[in-house]
Amino acid sequence: MKKLLATAILGLASLSALAGSATVEYSNVEGVNGAKNGKGYLVNWNDSITKTLDGGFQMTTAQTDGTNSVSTRVEASLTPKYALGFGTAYIKGSVGLKLNSAGSTEFYAVEPGIIVPLGGGFSTRIGYRYRAAFDSGIADTTRTARVGLTYALTKKDALTLRYDQQRGNSEQNSVNFAYTRSF
């Protein structure tokens, strides 16, 4: 399973040179229910495979404040999109690898959501992400409700402000700031 997952991730990573867009993101993380605060960083490459299907690859790194604890995730995704009269529905499916000092863990994630244009260059995205380890004996299950607001600076540049509320084996709220460049 690890070899198959690594091959899929590396294959999508090699395609990232042909990406239609790239995103960089900073997250300010507030731990809840006794969890510590932290910071997060994300780099994402995304491209349209067809008019209704996107493929993506992303890397995230999270650091817990006051510790040397760092966790990195590498993730490949496919996102079918469905046009609605007022916006676009999507269901993002991902597989990935979590790396930290304890080793590595394979995981999957599913995120249904909706993107609604608001006019004046603004759009909003509302989604719900479920993530879990393939190995049910590993405590890496989270449920994240998210809402974001994007402003298109130009046809190729956008800024996003997003709020995530994550519960499960990791309990935190985060405010996320992202810049996306389309090519």
Model regions and ranges:
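Outer-membrane beta-barrel proteins
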Residues: 2-183
